């Protein structure tokens, strides 16, 4: 057996984990068996925008996968449709549904518990049938792992009466000792996780919704999740690292939509210094342009905050600070080519007009008491103090820093997965369809190289020492990714926040999209991008989000090569998109696209209703996809090859067994 020195050293290291030929053989057999299993079901979701309850329901019902498992387990003779509906609701919301059932019936008898436990075991067995026993055991709740393992590996078709008696004794004991409710909750959560093997979040966990912190907590409970950062995610990440302009943007956006839950309750951000400053500085200013926006539901239920006038003052105060801070960044970085967003200095305080993109506009509000004519981008001493306090609060929020670490550990700007290319926004292009080159830290990048450069900069920003130019410049680039002219996450010439607040002329607020959005409609462009990123140009697809798919518009573009899964999960977009989000589901048989419709979750739990989802088949695979056909399988196959080489080394005497 001819082995290089380097290869022999590697096999020696590998032999420490597998010290005998028997152990190597066992592992090879195990891995080869895994390669023949069906691939797990993957779910792709984008643009959650902090809509926690809706996102959670989509996860719990796995875009209809749980209900499909129930239908596969039971015939109409075994269970009525109403009973299936109740079982599905119990799996989605076990704790809440148990409470509702007890409220309706007083108590639940042994017959109900016995039947329900056995039904749940059948559904769980179906949901976990693709996986090895080892993988299922690792996913089991610790307290019931042994019992669930015993129940899952029993079939009523078994001829052994002793085995049947054993299983029924387990179920009886669970009920007898008062653990049935806890067991129902545990096995229901196992089913929820089992029907989603991999979860891909294609950007924008954060935005105006008030539950982003809860979404992040939920994602951290999943073992196999990746995130392709969106523009809102990058903004919050930069804010968590203490970047002032990003902090101001996060606060302004939250305050505008009355989202104080994420800031104060979720992350413990102290808004008192900002509030006091706003009350003092804008005491006599009604700030009518800055009254918070209320959702349709809040308006219908008259759940407006009593202190809208105070909120408006805080909203204006942080908006003015934001525009100043952004101007400072743009003056520091002419290489961003965003001088068109430097307009404070053009303001005429006598005529109350301002010049933007070469046009003069009347200002709807010209009361800016902290604006300095000599340097309109300089913060007042009071504004400086406020921002120092806010930055301290963001950097020292334990929950926020935990979420930031998770985003860094599990996220990237793009990902190639099983031949598919995932990214949130766009690949910047020129008008002629060629890739756009941007200067990043003195070097020009386009396409994949550009996204790789930004990936690197975000990592640098996370570990570079504070108060260094390296950290400051890296954080400034993260802010640029939020709104920059050629940012792959923004995809717009400008974000017209200032114009929407202060300019009456709607044409001033028009946001021109990157040429990418025109070119990506063509299949040739999609194939070119897939090739650029090393994805599969023959069977691969681009999965993206960011731009809501309008009602009547197809989310599948470029002859099936591009799938946009931004379905408007935020309530304010439901009327635009005609739904409340998309989920792309890739199982071992086909690729499915589900468009979800709004649901009252409290009523759904009570009445055993489920979210209405329109499901279409995007692609049927020519044969069932196995583990060996996907990226994980290729990694396993390489592992098997290494182990076979180690086995040969043992047998040839090149390496001596350790046992």
Task: State where each predicted segment sits.
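Feature recognizes metal-dependent phosphohydrolase scaffolds
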Residues: 1-659
């Amino acid at each position: 057996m001819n082995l290089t020195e380097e290869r022999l050293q590697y096999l020696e290291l590998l032999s420490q984990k597998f010290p005998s030929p028997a152990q190597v053989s066992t592992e090879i057999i195990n891995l080869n068996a895994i390669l023949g299993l069906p691939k797990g079901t993957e779910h792709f979701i984008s643009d959650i925008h902090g809509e926690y309850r809706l996102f959670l329901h989509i996860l719990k019902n796995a875009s209809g996968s749980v209900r499909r498992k129930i239908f596969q387990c039971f015939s109409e003779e075994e269970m009525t449709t109403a009973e299936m509906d109740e079982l599905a609701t119990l799996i989605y919301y076990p704790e809440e549904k148990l409470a509702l059932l007890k409220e309706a019936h007083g108590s639940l008898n042994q017959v109900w518990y016995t039947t329900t436990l056995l039904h749940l075991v059948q559904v769980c067995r179906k949901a976990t049938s693709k996986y090895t026993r080892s993988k299922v055991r690792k996913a089991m709740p610790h307290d019931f792992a042994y019992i669930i393992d015993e129940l899952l590996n029993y079939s009523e078709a078994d001829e052994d009466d002793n085995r049947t008696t054993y299983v029924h004794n387990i179920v009886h004991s669970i009920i007898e000792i008062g653990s049935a409710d806890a067991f129902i909750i545990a096995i229901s959560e196992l089913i929820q996780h089992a029907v989603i093997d991999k979860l891909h979040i294609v950007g924008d966990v954060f935005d105006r919704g008030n539950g982003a912190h809860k979404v992040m907590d939920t994602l951290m409970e999943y073992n196999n999740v990746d995130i392709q950062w969106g523009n809102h995610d990058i903004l919050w990440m930069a804010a968590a690292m203490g970047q002032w302009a990003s902090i101001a943007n996060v606060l302004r956006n939250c305050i505008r939509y009355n989202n104080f839950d994420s800031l104060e309750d979720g992350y413990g951000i102290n808004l008192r210094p900002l509030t006091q400053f706003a009350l003092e500085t804008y005491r006599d200013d009604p700030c009518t342009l800055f009254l918070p926006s209320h959702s349709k539901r809040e308006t219908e239920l008259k759940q407006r905050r009593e202190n809208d006038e105070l909120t408006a003052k805080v909203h204006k105060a942080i908006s003015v600070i934001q525009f100043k801070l952004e101007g400072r960044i743009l003056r520091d970085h002419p290489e961003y080519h965003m001088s068109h967003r430097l307009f404070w200095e053009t303001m005429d305080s006598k005529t109350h007009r301002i010049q933007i993109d070469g046009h003069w506009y009347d200002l709807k509000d010209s009361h800016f008491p902290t604006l300095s004519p000599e340097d309109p981008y300089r913060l007042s001493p009071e504004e400086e103090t406020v921002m120092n306090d806010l930055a301290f609060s963001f950097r020292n929020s334990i929950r926020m820093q935990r979420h930031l670490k998770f985003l860094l550990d599990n996220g990237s700007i793009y990902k190639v997965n099983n031949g598919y290319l995932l990214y949130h926004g766009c690949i910047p292009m020129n008008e002629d369809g060629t890739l756009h080159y941007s200067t990043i830290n003195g070097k020009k990048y386009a396409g994949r190289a550009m996204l790789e450069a930004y990936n690197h900069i975000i990592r640098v920003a996370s570990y570079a020492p504070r108060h260094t130019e390296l950290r400051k410049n890296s954080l400034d680039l993260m802010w640029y990714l939020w709104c920059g002219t050629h940012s792959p996450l923004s995809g717009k010439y400008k974000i017209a926040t200032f114009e929407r607040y202060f300019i009456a002329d709607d044409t001033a607020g028009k946001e021109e999209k990157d040429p990418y959005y025109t070119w990506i409609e063509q299949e040739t462009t999609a194939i070119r991008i897939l090739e650029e990123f090393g994805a599969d140009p023959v069977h691969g697809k681009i999965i993206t989000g960011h731009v809501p798919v309008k009602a009547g518009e197809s989310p599948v573009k470029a002859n099936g090569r591009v799938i946009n899964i931004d379905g408007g999960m935020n309530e304010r977009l439901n009327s635009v998109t005609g739904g409340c989000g998309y989920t792309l589901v890739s199982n071992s048989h086909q690729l499915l696209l589900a468009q979800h419709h709004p649901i009252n979750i409290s009523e759904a739990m009570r009445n055993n209703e489920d979210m209405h989802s329109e499901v279409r088949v995007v692609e049927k695979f020519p044969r069932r996809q196995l583990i060996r056909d996907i990226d994980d399988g290729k990694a396993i196959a390489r592992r098997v090859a290494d182990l076979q080489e180690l086995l040969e080394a043992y047998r040839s005497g090149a390496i001596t067994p350790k046992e």
